Amino acid sequence: MGMRFTHTSTRLLASTALAVLLTAALTGCQTTQKQETTGSLPASSAANSEADWRREVDTWAALYRSHPEDPVNAMQYAQALRATGQRSQAVAVLEQASIQNSTNKALLGAYGRALADVGNYSQALDVLSRAHTPEQPDWRILSAQGAVLDQLGRYEEARGYYASALKIIPDEPTILSNLGLSYALSKDLVKAETTLKRATAQPGVGPRARQNLALVVGLQGRFAEAEKIARADLPPEEAAANVVYLRQMLSQQQKLDDKKLAPGKPAAPPARSATSPAARS
């Protein structure tokens, strides 16, 4: 399946390229997957094609209609809906299921992520806080909470959650990837690169962390190195598409920088990203 990219609604950011970093990792944070990334050049879904996901929608829709109170039916149906871009419907499904299963922590985790997916960050934080307890913290939920705080521009708070998650599972690449992007969003590209390199050095790391690293390296002007990183771990067709996208983002960044430096012209307003069909945490 070709790589696709999403832009979720974000706080004001200084550039289009950094706005892309807030592509919700949360958009791919399913309860059955290890994907809780703040944002990125989203990785492709190796498991399911778009046609596969549409079949999943039909399958789980039937099961959900027959037993809407079953949390597994609701979560699987919502996952398929999110994968096919039907995010608002996924929220509605999980909201109804959470009313009937108010103490099901896995369901609350899925609901919180889905809320973040549609930009309801404050409500997402509230729901995610009920998806685990201080006595039994879940590193995936901690990472998701950090990702939501990053969406709100509360970077220091977000890093506290990532630190707590890393105490539970040290050097987990999805947490490190989020942490690296948190630094990037606050314009500390050196720390971002260091952290993302640490993420990509871990065993079993997925392609997403490498694509995040590629964007951060490119934002520092090392374009050839960024393209080399962007091509890694991908089939030729997807690698080429990823490089094209990387070049587009970096080109937009350069145009904004040139506009800000042009004499006699007001600085360009901060970019907002808009929601579009998604790939990915």
Placement of each model-derived feature along the sequence:
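N-terminal leader/linker segments that initiate helical-solenoid repeat arrays
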Residues: G2-R4, R11-L12, L22-Q76, A80-T84, ...
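Terminal, low-structured helical/coil segments at or just beyond the last alpha-helical repeat
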Residues: Q33-E36, P203, P207-A209, L213-S281
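Structural marker of alpha-solenoid helical repeat scaffolds
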Residues: S66, Q100-N101, A131-E135, I168, ...
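Helix-start (N-cap) detector for alpha-helical repeat units in TPR-like alpha-solenoids
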Residues: P71-V72, K105-A106, D138-R140, Y155, ...
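Canonical tetratricopeptide repeat
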Residues: Q76, A110, S143-A144, N178, ...
